Each structure stands twice: as structure tokens, then as C-alpha cells.
């Protein structure tokens, strides 16, 4: 047990934003729990790149797994300074096709995207309070504008935004809680969801909608998460859009 080293838990850390955030924290001296659900090999690769890190399997929809993930951090480092709730899931169903999305789909998406962050925060709360720790929830602009991969996903991220505000209010002053809201983020998750053939076309469509004319990388989202953890001591209860201006949109060509 090395209580002098700060420690962080990143859920859903085998790929994408979670992996990039794990690496970001490791380069700043954090010990990192790299949580994964299915991608053991990918998580092990991320943990190896992070140095003082461990990969821990767990489904955040299961409370016992959440408590085991928090326990792994305490066993290794004796403290939890930061929790990044990045694990997420969806059903890629066009919003025009209501009949394809059913109650079990909503239940699974909400179990991971809303109940998971709540259970992880609850499991880590006492340790976070001891060190004036930080929670960052990885939400989505979908939760504000009602777009995205499905009704279930957008609704779950809207709920996560509200959960962020509730936790920030009630865990203060010891713990800060914020959320980052990405838009389209390059990487495997969306590529697998929309299919290889459609990926570049969909990416271009989202870039055209964005005020900055581009989409984001996992590393750029990780930079924002890292700032909320290490560089924003008076920021709490905030929903930070990290979306290249997708939610803002672009003016009509005649207005530019």
C-alpha cells in the first residue's frame, strides 16, 4: 500500500476515452485502476502502458463489482483521489424506428450509463471524501439535445447529467463532481456501431454540423477530464461540452 501516490479509477478504460484518460493520469503520477468488462487483453495493454496500474474486470451495473473495483484501488494504494465514470453502452437504433427499441434495451442502457456511475460513486465516496477527491462522469451532448445512437442512449445521458448535479450538491464540500459531454468521438465504439462502410460518411456529417468543422479524439476529451481532476479546484456541478461545437452548430452558409 502506497498512500503517498494519488490513485484514480477509470471505468470502461480498455479503449477510447477511458484508455486515453488512464494514460493521461498515469503521466501525471497517478496509480490507475483500468476497469474493463470484456476486453481483458486491451485493458492489460493500457495498464502496462500506465506503469503503476492494475486492470480489474467488472460490470458497473452490478453493485458487488463496483465495490470490488473500489476495493482494488484501496488495496493497492490505500486511497482514491479520482473516479472517472467512463463505462457506457448503447443500442444503435435510428430514432425513426421506434419499434426496434424495447424496454429491456432501455433497462440495460440505464443500468450501465446511469446506475453504474451512481454505484461506483457510492462505492468510492468515503475514500474520495478523505482526500477531497473528484468524480468526472463521461456523459454526452446527446443528453442535452436528444440526438445520438438511440432514444435509450440520449435519455440515459440526460439522466446522468442530472445525477451529476445531484451528486455535486450533496457530496460537497469534500468531493467535486462534474461531467464532460462529448459529441462524435473518433474510435472503435462508433466505428463498430455504425459499421466500417458508413463510418467515414457519418463522421463527415457530424463534422459538418460542428461549429469547429471537425470531431474530437479520445485524447482531447481526456485532456478535459484531466483538467477537471487536476486544474479546476473550484469547479463543481458543471456539464462541460467537449464536442467541437456540435451542440452549438454552424450558421447557414449565407450568414458566414
Walk through the language-model features, giving the residues of each.
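Residue(s) in the substrate-gating loop at a strand-loop-helix junction
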Residues: 140
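C-terminal substrate-recognition "lid" of short-chain dehydrogenase/reductases
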Residues: 127, 214-242, 247
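Alpha-helical segment proximal to the catalytic Tyr-Lys
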Residues: 126, 168-173
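Substrate-binding pocket helix/loop in short-chain dehydrogenase/reductase
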Residues: 94-98, 102-107, 206
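Short C-terminal tail/terminal secondary-structure segment
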Residues: 90, 95, 145, 226, ...
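Short, small/polar-rich loop/turn modules that mediate ligand/substrate recognition or access, typified
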Residues: 172-176, 235-237
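Active-site helix of classical SDR
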Residues: 121, 156, 164
